[in-house]
Regions:
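N-terminal Rossmann-like NAD(P) cofactor-binding module of classical short-chain dehydrogenase/reductase
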Residues: 34, 57-58
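Local beta-strand N-terminus motif with an aromatic residue
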Residues: 30, 53-54, 97, 136, ...
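C-terminal capping/lid region of NAD(P)-dependent oxidoreductase domains
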Residues: 133-142, 150-172
Length: 172
């Protein structure tokens, strides 16, 4: 997400729950980093954005982080819901949407592919072109044989993932 944001010209603030994860993400060159493990995400985002808040928030975690993210979004900002690796599906407070003129957008690639196949294909082609041009360099940090899918999935549910975690499907 950091790398894609940078390629698209955004000022990117990367946030993570540990300094170890932030050290990892720095190789993607975010403009700033925030450790939200202390529960002060809003204050830190506001300090980095001249008290405005973030225009777009990418949230793959959900749970308590989602609750904090809703409070540090800028006027007319968008909160992109990618997943719920925290294990808790949060609720979006309508009063925050009203007060901030913000919106929440669910990003579900599987459904997007089904409902808008042409747009999906166009987006995929753009990503592949960026990759071929060397603008996107995903880092695979762990790879598992397909039989160990539960182990790979647990990396996410235990919030231990850094970089890309993949499954190997070998033809026989």
């Amino acid at each position: 997400a950091v790398e894609l944001g940078k390629v698209m010209g955004a000022r990117v603030i990367a946030a993570a729950s540990t300094d170890e994860k932030l050290d990892f993400v720095k190789q993607y060159h975010p403009d700033a980093t925030i450790n939200y493990g202390d529960g002060e995400l809003k204050e830190k985002v506001k300090a980095l954005t001249n008290d405005r808040g973030a225009d777009v928030i990418y949230d793959p975690v959900g749970g308590d982080l989602f609750d904090q993210s809703c409070r540090c979004i800028n006027w007319n900002g968008r909160l992109l819901v990618i997943g719920f690796t925290s294990g808790r599906i949060p609720e979006y407070k309508a009063n925050l949407a009203l007060l901030k003129g913000s919106s929440m957008v669910g990003v579900f690639l599987g459904r997007f592919r089904k409902e808008e196949p042409e747009a999906y294909e166009q987006n995929l082609n753009e990503l592949l072109e960026m990759y071929a041009a060397g603008k996107l360099n995903p880092i695979v940090t762990q790879s598992f044989p397909k039989e160990e899918y539960v182990k790979a999935f647990n990396i996410f549910t235990q919030r231990q993932a850094k970089g890309k975690v993949t499954l190997e499907f070998k033809s026989e």
